[in-house]
Amino acid sequence: MNNWKRFTFFDIETVKQVEKEDGSSLQKLSITCTTSGRGSLIIGDAEGFINFVDREFGISSFQAYQQSVSLIYQLKERNFLSSVGHDDIGGAAILKIWNLDKTDKNEQPICVRSIKLEKSVTVTCFTLLEDLSQIIVGLANGEIIIIRADIFRDKVIKQKIIKVPNDSPITGLGFFPTKSQQSASAGAVLFVVTTTHVITYHTAHKDQETIIDDEGGDIGSFLMSDDGSPIIARSDAIYFYNVDGRGPCFGFTGVKTKVLWFRSYLVVIGYDTNNTNALFPGAVVGGQNSIGGLGSQTGSIGSPSVMVQNTKNNVLNIYDLKNKYIGFTEKFDTVSHICSEWGSIFIFGADGKVFQLEEKDTQTKLETLFKKHSYQVAIDLAKSQHYDNSAIADVYREYGDRLYAKGDYDGAITQYLCTIGQLEPSYVIRKFLDAQRIHNLTSYIQALHEKNLATANHTTLLLNCYTKLKDVKKLDHFIMTDNGTFDVETAIKVCRQGGYFDRALFLASKHSRHDWYLKILLEDLNEYRKALDYIQTLDWEEADKNLKKYGKQLVSEIPEETTGVLMKLCTNYQPVQAFDSLTALNLNGLTISNQTTTTTTVTNVTNNNNQNNNSNNNNQNNNNNNNNNIGFKQKSAPEEFIHIFVSQADWLVKFLEYMVQQGNNESSLIYNTLLELYLRDDVNQTDDERIKRKAKAYEFLTNPKSKFDQDHALILVQVHNWKEGVLYLYEKLELFNEIIEYHMENNDYDGLIKACKRYGVKDPNLWVRALSFFSTNKQDCQDEIIEVLTNIDKENLIPPLLVIQILSQNKNTTLAVIKDYISRRLSQETQQIDKDYTQIRQYADETEKMRHEINELRTNSKIFQQTKCIACLLALDLPSVHFLCQHSFHQRCLGENERECPSCAGANKRIQEIKRSQADSANQHDQFFKLLRSSPDGFTTVSEYFGRGILN
């Protein structure tokens, strides 16, 4: 332990003398024992007084004994003070319990119990439990007095005497409870130290005695630590104990006269008997140690010191046993007592001097350690003071900077590793990049990855370090065993840039980075078939995405296989399972194993199409089992893959034809594109191939299941000047005028006549357009004109005068061409005129007759000669009703309607409806003009409206 570093972590000062009114002061007390607690130093003196010293060193006292106070102890849990003293010289000692919270009329604490000990032997020490259920007193003759009672209620207190082996004086007493016992009083173990032995007594087992050590300790050498561990300071070492015996020890040599536990420190006062100054430098050997007391707030309470004259110096050392350093060292001429309170240690000298040791704050201690470059001690100190991780990391950084400046790069990186998570990594990385310490840098970045604190840049740097060091083994270990502690994409990039394509492929496969896997296969290795095989192992979404991205490249290199995969993808895609061996990695050579080829070709797809349809149910069940029970077809939209066939038109045709055959695609783009491909002219095509393509195109157009866009298709056939397609689409769209126009533009007279005959039923005006065309044609079209006039005459499409005006535009048209037409029309007109005159005379006669009847009814009487009722056909009798229409009825047969003849009511009603309808039609202008436009003879329509009186 001689290599422990020494520091001055305490400030020492002499306590100034503060005198009371009676002249007493702390320095003038004849101190016999000390303790502390509840914010006071408690001192027993030789006059029997117990003195309480406050923080300003003011003293308040009360008379506790008539003679001297030997021992005192302040309880921690209650404000009770226990003391041992004498009222008579040479008499038995008296144990008293004081309640410091209550006072008598003299303002003195109340003594709640006074127990006179049965033995008139010097009391060396005593201890008690906090609940006062057990009080143990140690005597100089080797006897122990055990008091177990309710000191507040029991009238008689029994004292049990136990003798220790060899009748050795008792030098220390203490309790520590066992963990298995719930009650401290029931399960407490009494720890007894004599000058020759260390003994335990199990109070729960009839004070069963167990000797746990054959070496004891002197007065003042025993104490209990804050955690309840017994400590014995011997000349060879400091020993810790537990219930079973010795625990750890610290080899501090030298005689220890007094010990104290202060916070986490062990305070030792003593001297070195061998004058080696190992533990107590500067101590002078001399005199003989007498049995002295130690007033302590922990552990046993020792007997009063009997100071003998000596010339040796006492040396005080304060040890931090956890962090292993000496926090303070100081010499004193004499030391009679030591205790602590208010965060300070108080040293009482026999000469009346009192010294106060106050611990420096942690920051000051750390600064001191930094100046002395004791960084490891600083780290331990910061941890023991429960500094946060950030503050501790600052200490590690300081330590690392110190080692780095000294050139100890390995040691520096060890300290920097402890700052991970607190210190910015770039601070460390920059240092070792500048110094070209790649090995150290690699260690640091590895640690960043292990703690999941690495960024993509860190991964890049680490892999670059591996590649720069050509440390393939570490590179392989990193990518093989690391579980999510690095950025995968960055690792793939670095391996790819460094030419480690097999490692990059492994990472991409292991972490399902499909895009990177395919990019390496296609762009770096040109393994097109393997790439396509890999795509087929992916689920539908990934396969769809990657074929859209890399399909163009794959179609250019392996068109048949790629087209086959696309056919599957767009119909009923199911991933294949033949690529599992892809991730197998040979660590010696690190090569990707050969996988089974699973590429689908167009031939395979088309040949198996019918079989798949026939066995759809069985396949569906199998597919469900192989694909996580997916109960629906996964298929892509074929129109989204058209662009990848930009340089492979023939394979695009096959792909689209297959999609059309499936008949389950609603996109018109598929059909439009296929039609365009059929019509495209290719210089490499033979005439037979062109004819076959046009035949396919016509079959495609006429197929009722085709879902092409008609307008788009019309543009295509027009652009490619495909007559059959143009005429078919015109007909399908009922664009009859465009059909006529097409024949006119191509001077196809026969086609024009045929079109008029075919579509003239639906649109008679086609003949009129044909007549206009032939009339303006410079060629001889007399036969065609005759044909047209025949059909115009048959349908009576236009007046003869208009026909003559149209034909007059062609100078080549002779009268012979229209001779038959004019003769026929004049004959028809003459017949129609005669017919109209006959009808006019008939209407005039009927009108005159009606006027005569009206006049007769107005001017002459009407004779009713009916003898039978029209309703019941019985003879008329009174009362009866006669109408001007010559119908007669019984009044009883008419009922309530006597104003209108029932027999004529229907005809009258129809006439009224006609008149009402004509009146309504007078306001329906749109209907009139619509009828006028659709009528072959507008004049007839207007005349008819005039005849009805609608226009009146």
Curated annotation (Swiss-Prot):
Where are the stretches annotated Disordered?
608-632
Q: How does it sit in the membrane?
A: Peripheral membrane protein
Which keywords, in A-to-Z order, does the entry hold? Coiled coil, Membrane, Metal-binding, Protein transport, Repeat, Transport, Vacuole, Zinc, Zinc-finger
Which taxonomic lineage is given here?
A: Eukaryota, Amoebozoa, Evosea, Eumycetozoa, Dictyostelia
- Which function does this protein serve? May play a role in vesicle-mediated protein trafficking.
Task: List the record's Gene Ontology CC terms alphabetically.
Answer: endosome; HOPS complex; vacuolar membrane
Bias-annotated ranges (Low complexity): 608-629
- Zinc fingers (RING-type): give the ranges: 869-905
Enumerate the CDD domains for this protein.
Answer: RING-H2_Vps11
Question: Which ranges does the UniProt record give for the CHCR repeats?
Answer: 416-563, 629-783
Q: Which PANTHER family match?
A: VACUOLAR PROTEIN SORTING-ASSOCIATED PROTEIN, VACUOLAR PROTEIN SORTING-ASSOCIATED PROTEIN 11 HOMOLOG
Q: Which InterPro entries match?
A: ARM-type_fold, Clathrin_H-chain/VPS_repeat, TPR-like_helical_dom_sf, VPS11, VPS11_C, WD40_repeat_dom_sf, Znf_RING, Znf_RING/FYVE/PHD
Gene Ontology BP, a term:
organelle fusion
Write down a Pfam family by its short name.
TPR_PEP5_VPS11
Q: Extract the coiled-coil ranges from the record.
A: 837-868
The keyword Transport appears for this protein: yes
The subcellular localization recorded is:
Vacuole membrane
What protein name is recorded for this chain?
Answer: Vacuolar protein sorting-associated protein 11 homolog
**One Gene Ontology term of the molecular function aspect:** protein-macromolecule adaptor activity
Similarity annotation: Belongs to the VPS11 family.
> Where is it chiefly localized?
membrane
